[in-house]
Regions:
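Conserved Class I SAM-dependent methyltransferase catalytic core
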Residues: 236-282
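SAM/dcSAM-binding transferase cores
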Residues: 3-4, 15, 35-39, 221, ...
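Conserved proline-anchored active-site loop of SAM-dependent methyltransferases
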Residues: 130-143, 202-220
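S-adenosyl-L-methionine
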Residues: 2-5, 14-18, 26-128, 156-201, 293
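Mobile active-site "lid"/loop adjacent to the S-adenosyl-L-methionine
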Residues: 209-239
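Conserved SAM-binding motif I beta-strand of class I
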Residues: 150-155
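A short, acidic, amphipathic alpha-helical segment used as a generic capping/interface helix at domain edges
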Residues: 190-194, 231-244
Length: 293
């Protein structure tokens, strides 16, 4: 599979669809952090692609092993097998999977998604753009893309970015997901840096920084593995300031339902669900209104 590299300069164009490209993903180096300690790339099992594993190992600058038995107990590894790329550690396994979201992006369900409602732009139609500044495994970005946004996904951790890139590439072959995935572009690097480099203002910036609070049982495995790579946001104010400085019409901040405001900044209004809350900051020129859950 061809991999398309895009310069970190001129990122304003990066929300455009990837029409006619062989891969669904464009990547850019924008100061991504190095891989976590004790990470190895492992190729194993029928259907595994040794060439893909070797390229991933080289890209991340980590050892390439043949079989999980070669990985030290307690160490994390990126497993490349016939199912794609997974992060494994101590019997836990994390793999991006957009297929399980197929029902949520159906037209009859998409409009009920709280994120889609929060990101809605009054009077907006086609050509809307968004930056998911804390992409993670890309589920929120997929919802926005399915809703018609061209989405730039920022992910600073190269291991999580590798999982996300694999998810996007696999989803590009899905009849259900391909149309949305064509509107998603991945940029590896610090989101504050990427937001500062944008040539054009997006309509929406989405923020969902790692939250250091308690873990729900359903999310525990995912959080445990991700938190071995990414720490909670260490400068919330800087992140919000960069998002606002990018000049969007709206900044949407995903928070735990009962969590505090990000950086202590009161939103213009919020949309609340049982588990999460979306706090919305509206640019003054587009009119603000106050509302709460």
């Amino acid at each position: 599979m061809a991999e398309h590299e895009a310069s970190a300069e001129g990122l304003g164009a990066m929300s455009a669809p990837l029409a006619g490209e062989a891969s669904s993903v464009a990547t850019a180096s924008a100061g991504a952090s190095g891989p976590a300690a004790a990470i190895a790339c492992v190729v194993e099992g029928p259907g595994a692609a040794p060439g893909a594993a070797a390229r991933l190992s080289h890209r991340l600058g980590v050892p390439l092993e043949h079989g999980l038995a070669q990985v030290d107990q307690g160490a994390s590894a990126l497993l490349v097998d016939g199912q794609g790329v997974s992060l494994v550690r101590d019997g836990m396994r994390l793999k991006g999977d957009f297929e399980r979201m197929a029902r949520r992006i159906r037209p009859d369900a998409l409009g009920r998604e709280l994120l889609v409602r929060a990101a809605r732009i009054k009077g907006g139609s086609g050509g809307l753009t968004a930056v998911d500044a804390t992409a993670g495994l890309g589920e929120d970005a997929l919802l926005l893309a399915a809703a018609g946004f061209s989405v730039t996904l920022c992910e600073r951790d190269p291991v999580i970015a590798a999982l996300l890139r694999d998810s996007l590439d696999r989803a590009a072959a899905s009849a259900v997901l391909a149309r949305a995935v064509e509107r998603m572009r991945l940029v590896e690097g610090d989101s504050v840096d990427v937001l500062h480099r944008l040539d054009a203002s997006p309509d929406v910036v989405l923020l969902d920084p790692m939250f250091p609070g308690g873990k729900r049982a359903a999310a525990k495995k995912k959080l445990q593995l991700i938190q071995t790579l990414e720490a909670p946001c260490d400068d919330e104010g800087k992140l919000v300031a960069a998002a606002m400085a990018a000049g969007p019409r709206k900044v949407v901040i995903k928070r735990p339902a009962k969590g505090p405001w990000l950086a202590g900044i009161e939103p213009d209004y919020s949309l609340c669900g049982k588990a999460v809350r979306y706090d919305c900051l509206v640019a003054p020129r587009y009119g603000r209104h106050r509302g709460a859950c």
